[in-house]
């Protein structure tokens, strides 16, 4: 499953759990799935961040440069 699908599924799980009308077993099952998806998405974001750093590692003058990739929306 790609990142976008995992994130979409995670959003579905959150919406279902926020309603508060699930049985305990179903809540636990969805929570477990959500934690797994969250970890996988976080790992993929870390990989993407590392790739951005690598791609931006050489400046216009040819000198190595490390630029941290941070979102200003956070």
Swiss-Prot record:
Enzyme Commission number, as recorded: 3.1.11.6
Catalytic activity: Exonucleolytic cleavage in either 5'- to 3'- or 3'- to 5'-direction to yield nucleoside 5'-phosphates
GO terms, biological process: DNA catabolic process
Molecular function as annotated in GO: exodeoxyribonuclease VII activity
Subcellular location, principal: cytoplasm
Places the protein is found: Cytoplasm
Pfam families associated with the record: Exonuc_VII_S
Keywords from the named record: Cytoplasm, Exonuclease, Hydrolase, Nuclease
CC per GO annotation: cytosol; exodeoxyribonuclease VII complex
Quaternary structure annotation from Swiss-Prot or TrEMBL: Heterooligomer composed of large and small subunits.
PANTHER family: EXODEOXYRIBONUCLEASE 7 SMALL SUBUNIT (PTHR34137:SF1)
General function of this protein: Bidirectionally degrades single-stranded DNA into large acid-insoluble oligonucleotides, which are then degraded further into small acid-soluble oligonucleotides.
Family: Belongs to the XseB family.
Name the record gives this protein: Exodeoxyribonuclease 7 small subunit
Source species: Bdellovibrio bacteriovorus (strain ATCC 15356 / DSM 50701 / NCIMB 9529 / HD100)
Name of encoding gene: xseB
């Amino acid at each position: 499953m790609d990142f976008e699908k995992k994130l979409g599924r995670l959003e579905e799980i959150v919406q279902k759990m926020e309603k508060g009308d699930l049985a305990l077993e179903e809540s636990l099952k969805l929570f477990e799935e959500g934690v797994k998806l969250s970890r996988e998405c976080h790992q993929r974001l870390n990989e993407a961040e590392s790739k951005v750093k690598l791609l931006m590692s050489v400046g216009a003058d040819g000198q190595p440069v490390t630029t941290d990739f941070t979102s200003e929306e956070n």
